[in-house]
């Protein structure tokens, strides 16, 4: 994992396995099934880093030889919140890593004319004492990510409780996001070159939602 000189609160997960799988996802010939499976695998691998600083507690257990106070994390103190619909598959990967975590949902779609997010669903677990991992494959303009964090704030979640995880990010999106929420760390597998006039990340991987679900 490395940082970026222009974005001090951006963390790029450059593990070889993550980069290898991301390259396969970028390939336009990748099938829907293959694209979906790769995203789930990358999310699980990214989850290892994004949960690195989860606090541990102890639990008394019995091994075959003795009793001990064993270090454990409290999965119920973690909430995974995908931005629908594309974030759902990333959430699946994270839930394999921490199956006891709670799951919320924020439904947004991007207006094709204004490029701004439109909200249609919000379902969240109790925020008290809980860390929230907000997930979306693409951090493009940054507008949806900012809106989603605003939704969490509106429901009692502080910026200090939030981590944002994206498969691929554009510099424009990172700037927009951190202009609004400078203390929320962003974790990504790839910081790409730029946005094109249609607000797609270049080189990117196309429309993640359409490629995940086989729609147009």
UniProtKB/Swiss-Prot annotation:
Binds 1 Mg(2+) ion per subunit. The magnesium is bound as Mg-PRPP. Its cofactor is Mg(2+). It holds the Pfam family UPRTase. Uracil binds at residues 201, 206-208. 5-phospho-alpha-D-ribose 1-diphosphate binds at residues 85, 110, 136-144, 207. It is an enzyme of class 2 (transferase). Keywords: Allosteric enzyme, Glycosyltransferase, GTP-binding, Magnesium, Nucleotide-binding, Transferase. Coiled coil: none annotated. It catalyses: UMP + diphosphate = 5-phospho-alpha-D-ribose 1-diphosphate + uracil. SUPFAM superfamilies: PRTase-like. InterPro entries: PRibTrfase_dom, PRTase-like, Upp_B, UPRTase/APRTase, Ura_phspho_trans. Allosterically activated by GTP. It comes from the Bacteria. One of its GO terms (molecular function) is uracil phosphoribosyltransferase activity. Pathway: Pyrimidine metabolism; UMP biosynthesis via salvage pathway; UMP from uracil: step 1/1. Belongs to the UPRTase family. Catalyzes the conversion of uracil and 5-phospho-alpha-D-ribose 1-diphosphate (PRPP) to UMP and diphosphate. HAMAP family: Upp_B (MF_01218_B). This is Uracil phosphoribosyltransferase.
């Amino acid at each position: 994992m490395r940082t970026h000189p222009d974005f001090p609160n951006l963390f790029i997960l450059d593990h070889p396995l993550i980069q290898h799988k991301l390259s396969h996802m970028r390939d336009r010939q990748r099938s829907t099934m293959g694209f979906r499976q790769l995203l789930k695998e990358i999310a699980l691998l990214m989850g290892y880093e994004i949960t690195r600083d989860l606090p541990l507690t102890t639990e008394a257990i019995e091994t075959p030889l003795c009793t001990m106070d064993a270090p454990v994390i409290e999965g119920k103190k973690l909430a995974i919140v995908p931005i629908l619909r594309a974030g759902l598959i990333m959430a699946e990967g994270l839930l394999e890593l921490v199956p006891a975590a709670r799951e919320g949902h924020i439904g947004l779609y991007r207006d094709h004319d204004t490029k701004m997010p439109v909200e249609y669903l919000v379902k969240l677990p109790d925020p008290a004492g809980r860390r929230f991992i907000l997930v979306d494959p693409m951090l493009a303009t940054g507008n949806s990510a900012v809106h989603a964090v605003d939704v969490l704030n509106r429901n009692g979640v502080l910026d200090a409780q939030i981590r944002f995880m994206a498969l691929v990010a554009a510099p424009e999106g990172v700037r927009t996001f951190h202009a609004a929420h400078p203390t929320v760390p962003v974790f990504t597998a790839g910081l790409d070159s730029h946005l094109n006039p249609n607000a797609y990340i270049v080189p990117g991987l196309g429309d993640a939602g359409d490629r995940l679900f086989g729609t147009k």
